Amino acid sequence: MQLSDFSFDLPKSLISFHPYFIRSTCRLMVMYGHTGMIFHKRFFNIIDEINSGDLIILNNTQVIPARFFGKKESGGKVEVLVEKILGINNILASIKNSKNINIGSKIFFGYKDKIKGSVVDCKNSFFEIFFHDNIDSAIDIINNIGEIPLPPYIKRFRNKLDVDLYQTVYKKKTGSIAAPTAGLHFDLPLLEALHNKGVDIDYITLHIGSGTFQPIRRVQIEEHIMHSESVEVSSSVIQKIKSCKKKGGRIIAVGTSTLRALESAYRSSKWSDSKDFISDTNIFIYPGYKHNIVDALITNFHFPESTLIMLVCSFLGYKNTMNAYNTAIVNKYSFFSYGDAMYITHNKLAPYENFII
C-alpha cells in the first residue's frame, strides 16, 4: 500500500492541545469491526462494552522528564531528549545543536553546570552520554534537571496540569518519552468500577520512544523500518491471557503500544512456554497483518500517514477505519494525544480486505 492511502484532511480546530481535566469524560466512539456500526458515547460508558471475565491489559510505563538543556565546552547551548536509559550512568539521547559533538565531547548540565556528561558513542542519530556524577544515577539526574516532553505538535508552555495529566494513573515503570495516550482516559473510579464488574486487569510495559512521532519517509509503507522499543510481558500475563481465552473471555488492549507488545511476545519463543518476554521490538503492524491476541482495542485518533493509523486499519479494516475517521471529523471529535478515544472490536476479515483504493 502507498503512504498516501492513509492521508486525510484534518481541520486544525480538531487538534486537542490541552487535556481533559476529568479523564473519563472525553468522548468515545464505539465501532464494531464485524458490522462497521458506530455509536457515540463518553469514555466512562466503556464499562458497558466490557464484560465480566474479560481481561484488560494496560501499558504501565511512566513518562520520564526526558528533555533538558546543557552547554558544550565551547559554551554553546544544546537541547537533549532522552531516548532510552541504558544503565546506571548512561543514556541514549538525541541532541539539538549537535554540531561539533563527537565521541569524547563534554556537555555540562544543571545548576552552575556542575553535572558533567561525556559522549562515549554515536549510534545513528543518537548519542550515548555517560554522567560522571558519583552520587546520583542517570534517572536521578534526569528527574532533577529534566522536564516532561509534550508531543512536538504542542507548542505551548507546559503547566502543572500536564505534569499530572500526561501520565496514566497506573504508571509504574519509568522509561517512556511519550505517554501511552489511550490510558490517559482511565481514572481510579473507572478502574474500580471495572474491577467490581468482574473484569480482570493486568499490565505490560513498553517504553515509548521518539520514533512514535517520526513520519514515514517511504512511498510504499512495506519498506518502512520501525524504531525499536523496550518491552516486557511477564509470564503471569501470558498465562492469564491463555486462561481468559480458554474460558471464553476477551482480551482488550489499551493502546497501540500494548497491542504491539502482546503481538511481539506472541511471535517469540517465550509465548508457548509462558515465560517472561523481555526484549526490544520493532514490530510494524499494517493492513494484511493477522492479529493473534487482542479482541478489542482502545485507542485515540491518530495522525494521518502514521504507523498508528496503519495498525488501526489492520485491526478494524481499512474501509471501517477511514469511515470512522471521517465520522469523527464530521462530529468534531478531538484528535491526537490529548484528544478523544475509540473502542473498536477486531474485524477478522480485515487481513483479506480488498486494498484497491
Swiss-Prot record:
GO molecular function annotation: S-adenosylmethionine:tRNA ribosyltransferase-isomerase activity
Signal peptide residues on this chain, from the entry's feature table: none
Catalyzed chemical reaction(s): 7-aminomethyl-7-carbaguanosine(34) in tRNA + S-adenosyl-L-methionine = epoxyqueuosine(34) in tRNA + adenine + L-methionine + 2 H(+)
GO CC, one annotated term: cytoplasm
Described function: Transfers and isomerizes the ribose moiety from AdoMet to the 7-aminomethyl group of 7-deazaguanine (preQ1-tRNA) to give epoxyqueuosine (oQ-tRNA).
PANTHER family: S-ADENOSYLMETHIONINE:TRNA RIBOSYLTRANSFERASE-ISOMERASE
Descriptive protein name: S-adenosylmethionine:tRNA ribosyltransferase-isomerase
Underlying gene: queA
